[in-house]
Amino acid sequence: MVAKNVKTFALGVEYDGSYYHGWQRQKILPSIQEEIEKALSIIANHKIDVVCAGRTDAGVHSIGQVIHFKTTANRKKSSWSIGVNSYLSENISVVWVKEVTENFHARYSAITRSYRYIIYNYSLRSAIFQTKLNHIYRKLNVDKMNFEAQFLLGEHDFTSFRALGCQSHSPWRNITKLNVFRFHNWVVVDITANSFLHHMVRNIVGSLIEVGISKKKEYWIKDLLEKKDRSHAGATAPAKGLYLVYVEYPLHFNLPRSAYTSIFFK
């Protein structure tokens, strides 16, 4: 797109990932990217391609996804939010829109990405939140989980926590925040890093769960990190408990931040 009147927009997007085969466009299966591009293309009256901050897997949700696109269409700002939402299903929503400079890139301009994993830790399962939380009936020791989690802070080789099919050239990532806490019957894992390997968050959570049910001894996470071997780690935690909650950008872009709903315990 080389026209002089090209504009670049950033959008904040929420979605319930239960109904889609992940963010990325698929040949046959439904994807969030495809649905958003269709709706934007209708409003723009030309084909729109979007770029996201983080490509979430099938079943993963978001309240903080950020995307950008370029367009030659001259539309009101509300057309890119209210108008687009009118063409989206109820489980996807644009929550803010901002015109940005042409050098903004949803993926490459991002400084950090924050995820939240939510576990319903109760003896009986929830019918209401069946596709929104991971149910663990055995009592989790949150203090142990949080203690072990701190060994993952900083820049490390996270080979032990990457998917076997991960295509990233480097296993090194920098985790700047990793906290585990309890809120009544919910156990929450908050994690922030510069970027993540494929399944990295869910593999970390799966291993922390084994710590929480006292299946592993103290310092197991530390040893696991040093082994650099995925086969020694815990099972990948289900996607349904994972939320992309926030993407941090340089302040000069002045992007809005989506407000947490009550389920996110703010």
Curated annotation (Swiss-Prot):
Q: Which residues bind substrate?
A: 115
Q: Where is the signal peptide?
A: none
Name the residues annotated as catalytic in the UniProt entry: 57 (nucleophile)
| Keywords linked to the UniProt accession | Isomerase, tRNA processing
Query: Which top-rank group of organisms is this from?
Result: Bacteria
Q: What class of enzyme is it?
A: isomerase
Subunit structure of this chain's protein: Homodimer.
The function of this protein is:
Formation of pseudouridine at positions 38, 39 and 40 in the anticodon stem and loop of transfer RNAs.
The protein here is known as tRNA pseudouridine synthase A
Q: Which organism is it from?
A: Buchnera aphidicola subsp. Acyrthosiphon pisum (strain APS)
Q: Upper taxonomic classification of the species?
A: Bacteria, Pseudomonadati, Pseudomonadota, Gammaproteobacteria, Enterobacterales
Gene that specifies this protein: truA
